[in-house]
């Protein structure tokens, strides 16, 4: 089950509910707001690496919602590493 505050964030940014399953047992570790509201880091703990499409979609929704902020970063800290999924991050660029 997804952490309640993470679920609230996803609903607020209108993340598609069909993507919620990728965040089962995920937690919002912390939100770091930098000086002058120029950057926010969302740091999530997940069970595994997210598919690149899910990561990009989530980041896009965060950027769209927090459009007054210059730089939004989504940092994922997976407990299990899948090298196959990681390689898709490099080939998608």
Feature roles, as predicted:
Residues 1-93:
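Intrinsically disordered, low-complexity basic tails and flexible linkers associated
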């Amino acid at each position: 089950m997804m952490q309640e505050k993470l679920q609230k964030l996803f609903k607020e940014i209108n993340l598609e509910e069909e993507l919620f399953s990728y965040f089962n047992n995920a937690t919002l570790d912390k939100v770091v707001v930098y000086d002058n509201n120029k950057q926010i880091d969302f740091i999530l703990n997940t069970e595994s690496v997210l598919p690149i499409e899910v990561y990009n979609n989530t980041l896009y929704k965060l950027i769209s919602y927090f459009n007054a902020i210059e730089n939004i970063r989504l940092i994922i800290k997976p407990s299990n590493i899948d090298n196959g999924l990681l390689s898709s991050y490099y080939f998608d660029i």
